[in-house]
């Protein structure tokens, strides 16, 4: 079976790295994620990753608690840097060559984000992990995923979550909630479905960049998507 995609952008939330823990990085969880990523890399699909920081610090929560929102967002960006380094290290142990590029400069630790370099590294078979979101406060890492996916020419944004797609309501709170197989960007925005923020949806819509929402906890889901199988929910123009 041939690959459905040549280049994809995977969005991982920081919360997904916690596993069953209340905080931080669960090593077993990150190793399982890397095993799924390794399968895709072996198929020959070029993979970029945008990673969140909510397992360490959430800028929105810091702002709500009385901290200056911009300061809180910068702290959240630093949290994504820690997650990116942890993910890169786990990939190295699994034999995957990966590079971290950051929207905030920290030259002794990671490369700065340079678009042509990122594209070249993808073409050479490396996984590129984008850290520090967009580098600007008030923008989520979901928006960073939409932005970087557009910049590097990804064919789809793969949004890994704890649920297996986009639902009409929160399935944990509403047992009658139904999962969409496909849904348009305009419909997702108008219904205020809280899977990605409206800015990310709007950017992907304008760039005609589809989003597939799937469960990170479902073994083999990432590989099945890359092979073109129906998994999760496709958000499209």
From Swiss-Prot:
Sorted alphabetically, the Gene Ontology cellular component annotations on this record are:
cytosol
Q: What's the encoding gene here?
A: pyrH
Q: Which InterPro entries match?
A: AceGlu_kinase-like_sf, Asp/Glu/Uridylate_kinase, Uridylate_kinase, Uridylate_kinase_bac
Q: Which organism is it from?
A: Burkholderia cenocepacia (strain HI2424)
Cite the EC number: 2.7.4.22
The alphabetical list of record keywords is:
ATP-binding, Cytoplasm, Kinase, Nucleotide-binding, Pyrimidine biosynthesis, Transferase
Listed name of the protein: Uridylate kinase
| Activity regulation as described | Inhibited by UTP.
Is-annotated flag, keyword Cytoplasm? yes
Q: Name one GO biological process term.
A: 'de novo' CTP biosynthetic process
